[in-house]
């Protein structure tokens, strides 16, 4: 009997005719009249060479969703925000008054640095405040984390050398970020979740409404693992992620929102860590992605690194010191490189001054140099060359030429680099459209999609595509594609296979993502086994393998034995993403952190309020002086001293209780002032109202009214 562990194999040969229904999407080519390849399940360590007989693929069913009937999720009467979770900066937007609006953060800025830090006192900092202290705390400041999300350690060997914190791998080969300040190792999803949490908190304050649902954007060329990891980050942050959409697609939504004319646009998205190109048809509320291409290892960080390496190599040649081994110096070099890159977008040269970058026995050392725009472009020439290929690929996949493009939309801060803009002009022969803010357009587009899902926006249909092909491992280490790239989402396809060996009772399905021909060059995003197949001659069992991709671009795969009805399925989460129980733990920790943050904020607010009460009380005691009766003054001073002690060392609740007690005593001051006899009022009846002094208005004189108490407004003429 064959081994129970098996995989899919493929052979050439004559086989059964294939029945196939054509897709409504023009990107698909099912070739219904061609003779199918022979595909069957066989042993992983099969001793066979070429079997003389084998069953072929028995049929193909394409259940691709109709192009214009994608039903949106409806969320009634709840604010849904759009979030651009960027490598270097993030932004959040929402629909306000029928238009997408950027949310300003607590610091008053429209974008938030994607930076998280932990201090020696174990305080957590997020955003601009975290970025500002990076130089003095490089090992505990996490930035460019998006480059590690959903990735395995062997995929990010080069990126891990470019950051000042320590990137390590866990027992499963997944990426972890070491934080010595609190003695913990974070998954990239956890750090991203903290950035998301700040964005959502800022949005809640801005909108004056609790936000729990969001649309999050990802680079178009993110694979399945990275998309699922991004969704996990949202869940850890306490969000329900309604949709994951591609960044260029989001940018097209912002650009094409309220535009009625039909246009073919090319979105050129060069951000901090990734590069994407998408070609879309836009018009009459329909946004159809024709093709997408990109490079997840190319972005503004790489341009910064070229400048850092240049500075470090020049310094090493002059001084013999390698600054790249000094984490604090590396962080200063990185910040200086970013600043110089930004300045060279508007200047032809910039001065770079880094005093006291290091020190030797001869004294402190400094960097003082000038970087010209020409030198910068020379340092980054190979990066600029890498931009060409994805642009050409996207047009070829869309079966278009540059003359067919009506508009070129620039997205991402790195598109402000003059050399990048010049390259776009040369490639496309068109002047780039600069009507949208490259830092904000993705978040604005995500807000439009959020509006569609919440019902705030109607008459918009978004037809996105899968960026990478999906398939199975077959004989000889070859990848057989089931869903080709640029297939419109959501989609569903199935194929029927058979076994390769007599008596085979189990098959193993290895799911792959990528464009290369061989398994070793593509990414394995999951595998599972279908057991319990009745022993039968090879080619007899019929095993249907079905691929489903939802609107988020996340894949589910199922395999069923048509003879027994036995079924096995899996939602592909990728080998590098977090197990469900680990995500659940992180969600609980995030909730605990949120509670702790709320308690810390409450403690700070309470202390500030108590300090104000102390100041006002002392001021009142000083102004009223001897007018306050001795016993009342003693009680107030006692409570005042107690409150000062509680502010210094008490709990938040103790401060609140003491503050309330002090306020009660302070109220007695006013009561005692009105109850005590006034000068000239010695004949007033006990417990009665004190009569006015002789120089007050005659209407206030009540001494001759037989002791009657008269209610009246009291006016101090002084």
From Swiss-Prot:
Q: Where is this region: Disordered?
A: 668-718
- Residue ranges, compositional bias (Polar residues): 668-678
Q: Which UniProt keywords apply?
A: ATP-binding, Chaperone, Chloroplast, Nucleotide-binding, Plastid, Protein transport, Stress response, Transit peptide, Transport
Any one GO MF annotation of this record: ATP-dependent protein folding chaperone
Say if the entry is tagged with keyword Transit peptide: yes
Alphabetized HAMAP family for the sequence: DnaK
Name of this chain's protein = Heat shock 70 kDa protein 7, chloroplastic
Q: Which gene encodes it?
A: HSP70-7
């Amino acid at each position: 009997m064959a081994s129970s562990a098996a995989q899919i194999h493929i052979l050439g040969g004559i086989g059964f005719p294939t029945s196939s229904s054509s897709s409504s999407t023009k990107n698909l080519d099912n070739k219904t009249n061609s003779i199918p390849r022979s595909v069957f399940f066989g042993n992983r360590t099969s001793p066979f060479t070429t079997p003389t007989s084998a069953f072929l693929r028995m049929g193909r069913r394409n259940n691709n969703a109709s192009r214009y009937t994608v039903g949106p999720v409806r969320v009634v009467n709840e604010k849904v925000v759009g979030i651009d979770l960027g490598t270097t900066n993030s932004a959040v937007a929402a629909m306000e008054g029928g238009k997408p609006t950027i949310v300003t953060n607590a610091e008053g800025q429209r974008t938030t640095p994607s930076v998280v830090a932990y201090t020696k006192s174990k305080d957590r900092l997020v955003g601009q405040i975290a970025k500002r202290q990076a130089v003095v705390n490089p090992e505990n400041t996490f930035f460019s984390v998006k480059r590690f999300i959903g990735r395995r350690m062997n995929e990010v060997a080069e990126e891990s050398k470019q950051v000042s914190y320590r990137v390590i791998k866990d027992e499963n080969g997944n990426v972890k970020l070491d934080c010595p300040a609190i003695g913990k190792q974070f998954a990239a999803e956890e750090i991203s979740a903290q950035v998301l949490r700040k964005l959502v908190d800022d949005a809640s304050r801005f909108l004056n409404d609790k936000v729990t649902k969001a649309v999050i954007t990802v680079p178009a060329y993110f694979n399945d693992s990275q998309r699922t990891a991004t969704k996990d980050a949202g869940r850890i942050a306490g969000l329900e992620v309604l949709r994951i959409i591609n960044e260029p697609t989001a940018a097209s939504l912002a650009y094409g929102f309220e535009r009625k004319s039909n246009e073919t646009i090319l979105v050129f998205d060069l951000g901090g860590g990734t590069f994407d190109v998408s070609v879309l048809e836009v018009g009459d509320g329909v946004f159809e992605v024709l093709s997408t291409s990109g490079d997840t290892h190319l972005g503004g960080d790489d341009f910064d690194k070229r400048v850092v390496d240049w500075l470090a190599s020049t310094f090493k040649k002059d001084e013999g010191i390698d600054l790249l081994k000094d984490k604090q110096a590396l962080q200063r070099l990185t910040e200086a490189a970013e600043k110089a890159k930004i300045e060279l977008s508007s200047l032809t040269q910039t001065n770079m001054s880094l005093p006291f970058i290091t020190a030797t026995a001869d004294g402190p050392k400094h960097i003082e140099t000038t970087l010209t725009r020409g030198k910068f472009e020379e340092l980054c020439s190979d990066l600029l060359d890498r931009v060409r290929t994805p642009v050409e690929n996207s047009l070829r996949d869309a079966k278009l030429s540059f003359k067919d493009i009506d508009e070129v939309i620039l997205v991402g801060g790195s598109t402000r680099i003059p050399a990048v803009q010049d390259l776009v002009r040369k490639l496309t022969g068109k002047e780039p459209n600069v009507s949208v803010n490259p830092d904000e357009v993705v978040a604005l587009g995500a807000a439009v999609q959020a509006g569609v899902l919440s019902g705030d926006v109607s008459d918009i249909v978004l037809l996105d595509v899968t960026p990478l092909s999906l398939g199975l491992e077959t004989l000889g280490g070859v990848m057989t594609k089931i869903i080709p790239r640029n297939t419109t989402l959501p989609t569903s396809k199935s194929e029927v296979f058979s076994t390769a060996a007599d008596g085979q009772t189990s098959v193993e399905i290895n799911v792959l993502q990528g464009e290369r021909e061989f398994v070793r060059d593509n990414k394995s995003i999951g595998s599972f086994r279908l057991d319990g197949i009745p022993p039968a001659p090879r080619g007899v069992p019929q095993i249907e393998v079905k691929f489903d991709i939802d609107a988020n671009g996340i894949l589910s795969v199922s395999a069923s034995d048509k003879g027994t009805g036995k079924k096995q399925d899996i939602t592909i989460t990728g080998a590098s993403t977090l197990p469900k129980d680990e995500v659940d733990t992180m969600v609980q920790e995030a909730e605990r952190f949120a509670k702790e943050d709320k308690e810390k904020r409450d403690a700070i607010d309470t202390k500030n309020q108590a300090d104000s009460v102390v100041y006002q009380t002392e001021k009142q005691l000083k102004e009223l002086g001897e007018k306050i009766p001795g016993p009342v003054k003693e009680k107030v001073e006692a409570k005042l001293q107690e409150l000062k002690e509680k502010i210094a060392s008490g709990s938040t609740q103790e401060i609140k209780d003491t503050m309330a007690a002090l306020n009660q005593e302070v109220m007695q001051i006013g009561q005692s002032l009105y109850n005590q006899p006034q000068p000239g009022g010695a004949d007033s009846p006990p417990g009665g109202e004190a009569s006015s002094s002789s120089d007050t208005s005659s209407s206030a004189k009540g001494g001759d009214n037989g002791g009657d108490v008269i209610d009246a407004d009291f006016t101090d003429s002084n």
